[in-house]
């Protein structure tokens, strides 16, 4: 599968006088159509990385290649049309008086034909299940509903890449799971690429690959299963998955279990298999 993003030897620091780099020689690739989660402690460089990809920041050195083209000052606005970004706090993204006005805002800036714009807004709201709230004021929505509208605003623009910058971190567990399942459905049905900065284990479990960042560098890449089998998850700013906690407790009780489980269902199946042999 071809790469839609290539990051090569990226360096960046917020203070030009400082000797300390926020990002120091960061390189990785994102394949077209994949879901890449980026994890690491606060300050590891995750958000800085995606802001550089989106052209919100300019690297001191290194290259960012998007769909075969090097990101430059001359083409940054063109490349931004390929990328939609959803941030942590949806209130900071709302500009419209109603939900449908807000989703239409980016399309208006692109000078889209009115009838096509109405069609795109309706389709986007239907995809995130918010069509019945189109005339509602954004301020009157729940946190999860606000993030759904933020996703709709991105989807309406028809990007190739969606970046979630801790977009689920302010939601309750049910709202987080609901939102990431919505994004996955949209990704799969439209063959989109998703980059997700997250500490949420359910979100990580849905991804194809995980990029682990530490102190401004890429520490490793792994599948979710490989990541969850690590014993130093807390050092990466992640909780131990529930299935890992259960596995440790069962091993301490004398049960022999495989090293990794990605879901509770896998653990249940293994336990049933063990019980059937007793």
Curated annotation (Swiss-Prot):
ATP-binding (A) component of a common energy-coupling factor (ECF) ABC-transporter complex. Unlike classic ABC transporters this ECF transporter provides the energy necessary to transport a number of different substrates. Forms a stable energy-coupling factor (ECF) transporter complex composed of 2 membrane-embedded substrate-binding proteins (S component), 2 ATP-binding proteins (A component) and 2 transmembrane proteins (T component). Signal peptide: none annotated. It is found in: Cell membrane. This is Energy-coupling factor transporter ATP-binding protein EcfA1. The keyword Oxidoreductase does not apply. PROSITE patterns: ABC_TRANSPORTER_1, ABC_TRANSPORTER_2, CBIO. It is a peripheral membrane protein. It comes from Streptococcus sanguinis (strain SK36). Its main location: membrane. InterPro entries: AAA+_ATPase, ABC_transporter-like_ATP-bd, ABC_transporter-like_CS, ABC_transpr_CbiO/EcfA_su, ECF_ABC_transporter_ATP-bd, EcfA_1, P-loop_NTPase.
């Amino acid at each position: 599968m071809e790469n839609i993003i290539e990051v090569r030897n990226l360096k960046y620091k917020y203070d030009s006088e400082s000797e300390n780099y926020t990002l120091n020689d960061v390189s990785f690739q994102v394949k077209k159509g994949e879901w890449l989660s980026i994890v690491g402690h606060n300050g590891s460089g995750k958000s800085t990385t995606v802001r550089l990809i989106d052209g919100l920041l300019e690297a001191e050195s290194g290259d960012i290649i998007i769909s075969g083209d090097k990101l430059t000052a001359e083409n940054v606005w063109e490349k931004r049309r390929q990328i939609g970004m959803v941030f942590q706090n949806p209130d900071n993204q709302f500009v419209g008086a109603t939900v449908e006005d807000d989703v239409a805002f980016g399309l208006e800036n692109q000078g889209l034909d009115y009838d096509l714009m109405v069609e795109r807004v309706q389709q986007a709201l239907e995809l995130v299940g918010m069509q019945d709230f189109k005339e509602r004021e954004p301020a009157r929505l729940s946190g999860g509903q606000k993030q759904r509208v933020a996703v709709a605003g991105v989807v309406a623009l028809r990007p190739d890449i969606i970046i979630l910058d801790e977009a689920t971190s302010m939601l309750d567990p049910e709202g987080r799971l609901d939102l990431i399942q919505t994004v996955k459905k949209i990704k799969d049905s439209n063959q989109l690429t998703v980059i997700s900065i997250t500490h949420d284990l359910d979100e990580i479990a849905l991804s194809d690959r995980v990029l682990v960042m530490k102190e401004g560098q890429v520490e490793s890449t792994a599948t979710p299963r490989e990541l969850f089998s690590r014993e130093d998850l807390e050092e990466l700013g992640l909780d131990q998955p529930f299935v890992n906690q259960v596995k440790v407790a069962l091993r301490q009780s004398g049960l022999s279990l495989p090293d990794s489980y990605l879901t509770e269902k896998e653990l249940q199946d293994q336990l049933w298999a063990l019980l059937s042999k007793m």
